[in-house]
Structure formats: C-alpha cells, structure tokens
Amino acid sequence: MCHRQLISSWLSLVLLASPLLAMWELKKDVYVVELDWHTDAPGETVVLTCNTAEEDGITWTSDRKSDILGSGKTLTIQVKEFEDAGGYTCHKGGEVLSRSQLLLHKKEDEIWSTDILKEQKGSNGKTFLKCEARSYSGRFTCWWLTAFGTDVKFSVKGSRGSSDPSGVTCGEAERVSGDNQEYKYSVECQEDSACPTAEESLPIEVVVDAIHKFKYENYTSSFYIRDIIKPDPPKNLQLKPSVNSQQVEVSWEYPDTWSTPHSYFSLTFLVQTHGKNKNRREKKYELFTDKTSATVSCHKISKVEVRARDRYYSSSWSEWASVSCSEVSVSR
C-alpha cells in the first residue's frame, strides 16, 4: 500500500493502533496487527473506536468471549496472541453500531510466518507461488498449495513494478484440486496495457494475501513475462506415410493461444519417438526443428510426441502433444 493510501486509510478512522506501523487496514473493517512472536513480547495496544455519533450507553463484545469487554465510545485492548484476534462489536441497546475484525501477522526472529502455504520446488529453488504465461499477451496464471481445506481465504493483487500499485488485474482465487492433505488454488491475471513486442523494464509483482482463521500472511512473486512463458502444446498433430515406407511425416500447428504473428513470435519444436521395436528393446529418437513438420521412423508399437518453446528466448517447454504410430498404415 503506497504512502498516500495509508494516510487516507488512517484518516478514515474506526481503528487506531500504537504504534501505527504495527497495524494496517487490509480491507474495510478488517485490520492486520503485526506481532513479535516470542514469550516476552508485550504485544500491541489497540484502541477501537465505535463508528457512531452516539456518546453514551455503548458496550463492547467479542465474538470469542461471552463477557462484555467494556463501555464507552472507545475500547483499549492488549493484542498479544490469537485469543485476542477476531471480531469486536460495539452496541447500544440491541443495535449493532459498528464492527471490526482483527487478524494477526506474526514475526519470529525477524522472519514473517509462512504457515498457510506449502513450499513448492521452483526453477530457482523453493517457492510458494508459481506463475506461467502461455504467450506474451500479458495474461498469466499463478497457483499455490495449502494444507488447509476450510477457514481459508485468498485475495490477489498485481502490479508492474512495486512503485505503481496498478497495471495488473487479477481475478478471484479458485480451488482447482484437493484431497485431505493438499489443496491447490489458482488465479488468472491480466496486464492492463500489455504490449507483447515491448522490452520489459520492470518486473510484474504478484501478492497473495492469505487468511486462515485469524492468521494473516502474505506471499510475493516477482517476474518478467518472458521468464514464465510456457506455450501450450502444438495442435493438430498428424501422421501420414512418406515416400520411404519405413518412415512417416509428422505435422502440427502452432497452438491457438500463442502470440502472433508467428514470423515474429516463433517457436522451436522437439520431436520425439519412443517405444519398443520388434525385439521389445526400448528405442528413443529426438529431433529439433523450427519447422512444423518432420520425417521420422515410426513403428506400430511406438508413438510420436512434439513439444514447443520460444525460439529466441529459453522458455519452458510445453507439455507433449502425442499421436500413436498405429494410427498410420505403413508397411514394416
């Protein structure tokens, strides 16, 4: 959040903390209290102010405690552990006047907690967020893993460079798979003014705000689109007999999602045949080509696979597109 936004948030009031830097507004009426997490830490003093013009007859309650916590327009609490987090409500009579939610972001030995997301193996070591782009259109997908199946929420924001909090629009995070041990979430993002042919001077930054019950954490990934490119597999993979009856011609097309024109955004391809020959010995053959066809040997019990990557920049390879050699009739 930029300096101007912080000033605006605090002037809008409802909640004040001491010191100010120990707490900030995540969204309307939801606040994050940052805590040093060790035995002797004093915690943070938080002053809640009821958002009302009323002055008298106001009482305070908490979602997590049955007793009335105090009376008056303000309530001072000491936030030290998760029992102090949750919802705080001010009332007058039977009417709810305002409500605020406190989340805790804990720091141990100067390191912020990373308990909600699971580490994944990335290209440059371990990471919590993985992102891929299928082209240079500015559209990309990020995903992450968590062990929590319930009481978890995510929100995602993106930017082109940390100084500009806009420029990238991200959708709602969605669960795409899961079992009793691991759940995968993903989000689609789009750079608002993407120019596929322009040189990238600033990286894209993606921040995931993660909430599990009353715990808050955030995770950041910074990258250039060119570094997360992974094309879709080649499409329309076909085999036909060649003049040499012991070989076949395999042909394919660029994936529909790849950037155009293809003369500028060119792909290179890896063609691979593997299987067992008549003597049941494993055979594997690889061919690199910039064309969209190749001639290969293709035994009936083998298959042909083709994958693609950016011709001029060392992107990730696409997944394989494959076709069985049994689909073409050639004499052996």
From Swiss-Prot:
PROSITE patterns: FN3, HEMATOPO_REC_L_F3, IG_LIKE. One of its GO terms (molecular function) is identical protein binding. Its main location: secreted. It is found in: Secreted. Coiled coil: none annotated. Keywords: Cytokine, Disulfide bond, Glycoprotein, Immunoglobulin domain, Secreted, Signal. It holds the Pfam family IL12p40_C. Transmembrane segments: none annotated. One of its GO terms (cellular component) is interleukin-23 complex. Residues 1-22 form the signal peptide. Residues 233-328 form the Fibronectin type-III domain. Glycans are attached at residue 218. Disulfide bonds join 50-90. Residues 23-106 form the Ig-like C2-type domain. One of its GO terms (biological process) is T cell proliferation. It comes from the Eukaryota. Belongs to the IL-12B family. Heterodimer with IL12A; disulfide-linked. The heterodimer is known as interleukin IL-12. Heterodimer with IL23A; disulfide-linked. The heterodimer is known as interleukin IL-23. Also secreted as a monomer. Interacts with NBR1; this interaction promotes IL-12 secretion. Cytokine that can act as a growth factor for activated T and NK cells, enhance the lytic activity of NK/lymphokine-activated killer cells, and stimulate the production of IFN-gamma by resting PBMC. This is Interleukin-12 subunit beta. It comes from Cavia porcellus (Guinea pig).
